[in-house]
C-alpha cells in the first residue's frame, strides 16, 4: 500500500503529513487528531480503509506535536485560529478541493469550528468522532462520571482542582484510573501506533485545553458551539462509545442540533472506538463515505 509522507511550510514552521493509498476518483478522507497535541499516530489503525475503499486517507500532526514543528517557546500560537489556518493551508498545499472530514475529540472540535465559523466549500461529509460542542457540558458530564470513582479518588481530584495542583501522586493515580475507564486503557495491548510514544503536545494541550479532560481552563475554555451546529448543512455522522468521555448525552446534543445527522453508538467502547472495534468502524466508514461521495 502506497504511503507518502511530507512536510508543508506553515507560519515559518513545518507541518508533517501522511497520505495513505493511491489517488482515485473518490474524495479523500482527512483526519483531524485529538488533544490538542495527541498526534496522528493512532489514526494509523485506519490505514487499511485506503485499500478496502480505494480512497486516499490523509492525516497530519498539528503544529505543536509529533513530527511537525513544536514551538513550545511560543505557546501563544496554540489557538483554534492557528489550527484552522493550518487545516486550510494543508487543503491548499495538497489541492484538496473535495474531501470528507473526520475529527476525533479535539479534532472534532476543530472540525466544528471550521464548519461553523469559516463555511468551507468542498466538504462532502463530516464525521464527528467522540467529540463535543460545548466545553461546559463536557466538563459537567465528566464531573458526573467522576462521582462513580472510589471516594478517595474523587477526593484527590477535588483537592487538585481546589488547589490548582495537578502533580500530587494521589491525583495522578485517580486521573489515570478515570482515563483508563473512559479514554483508553493503556494497560492493555494495542497496535504499535496506539502504544507509540508521542512527541511533544503537552504545552499545546495545557495551553489550549487545561491540565486534564474535565478542567477546561485554557484558551478553549469558552468553546460553546451547540447553538451554532445548525450551520452545518453537510451529511454528518456522529460516533461515540458507551463508556466514552463523550457521553451519550454529549453525543445526542450534537445529533439533536445537526439536521439529518446520524449517530452510531459503539457498545463497550470508550474514547477510541476506531481502535477498540477497528474492523466494525472501518466497515461503517466505507459505507458512509461511499454513500456521500
Curated annotation (Swiss-Prot):
InterPro entries: AB_hydrolase_1, AB_hydrolase_fold, AB_hydrolase_sf, Peptidase_S33, Pro_imino_pep. GO terms for biological process: proteolysis. It is found in: Cell envelope. Signal peptide: none annotated. The lineage of its organism: Bacteria, Bacillati, Bacillota, Bacilli, Lactobacillales. This is Proline iminopeptidase. Its EC number is 3.4.11.5. The active site is at residues 105, 244, 271. Releases the N-terminal proline from various substrates. Residues 28-277 form the AB hydrolase-1 domain. It catalyses: Release of N-terminal proline from a peptide.
Amino acid at each position: 500500500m502506497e504511503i507518502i509522507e511530507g512536510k508543508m511550510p506553515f507560519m515559518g514552521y513545518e507541518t508533517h503529513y501522511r497520505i495513505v493509498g493511491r489517488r482515485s476518483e473518490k474524495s479523500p478522507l482527512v483526519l483531524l487528531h485529538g488533544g490538542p497535541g495527541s498526534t496522528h499516530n493512532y489514526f494509523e489503525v485506519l490505514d487499511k480503509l485506503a485499500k478496502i475503499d480505494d480512497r486516499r486517507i490523509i492525516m497530519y500532526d498539528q503544529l505543536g506535536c509529533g513530527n511537525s514543528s513544536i514551538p513550545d517557546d511560543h505557546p501563544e500560537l496554540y489557538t483554534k485560529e492557528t489550527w484552522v489556518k493550518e487545516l486550510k493551508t494543508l487543503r491548499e498545499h495538497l489541492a484538496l478541493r473535495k474531501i470528507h472530514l473526520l475529527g476525533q475529540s479535539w479534532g472534532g472540535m476543530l472540525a466544528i469550528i471550521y464548519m461553523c465559523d469559516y463555511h468551507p466549500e468542498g466538504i462532502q461529509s463530516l464525521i464527528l468522532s467522540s467529540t463535543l460542542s460545548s466545553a461546559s457540558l463536557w466538563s459537567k458530564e465528566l464531573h458526573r462520571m467522576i462521582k462513580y470513582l472510589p471516594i478517595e479518588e474523587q477526593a484527590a481530584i477535588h483537592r487538585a482542582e481546589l488547589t490548582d495542583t495537578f502533580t500530587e501522586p494521589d491525583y495522578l493515580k485517580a486521573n489515570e484510573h478515570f482515563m483508563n475507564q473512559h479514554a483508553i486503557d493503556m494497560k492493555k495491548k494495542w497496535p504499535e501506533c496506539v502504544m507509540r510514544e508521542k512527541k511533544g503536545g503537552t504545552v499545546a494541550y495545557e495551553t489550549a485545553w487545561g491540565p486534564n479532560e474535565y478542567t477546561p481552563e485554557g484558551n478553549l475554555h469558552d468553546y460553546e458551539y451547540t447553538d451554532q451546529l445548525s450551520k452545518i448543512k453537510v451529511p454528518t455522522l456522529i460516533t461515540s462509545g458507551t463508556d466514552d468521555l463523550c457521553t451519550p448525552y454529549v453525543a445526542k446534543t450534537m445529533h439533536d442540533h445537526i439536521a439529518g445527522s446520524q449517530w452510531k453508538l459503539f457498545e463497550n467502547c470508550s474514547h477510541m472506538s476506531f481502535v477498540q472495534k477497528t474492523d466494525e468502524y472501518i466497515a461503517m466508514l466505507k459505507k458512509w463515505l461511499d454513500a456521500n461521495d
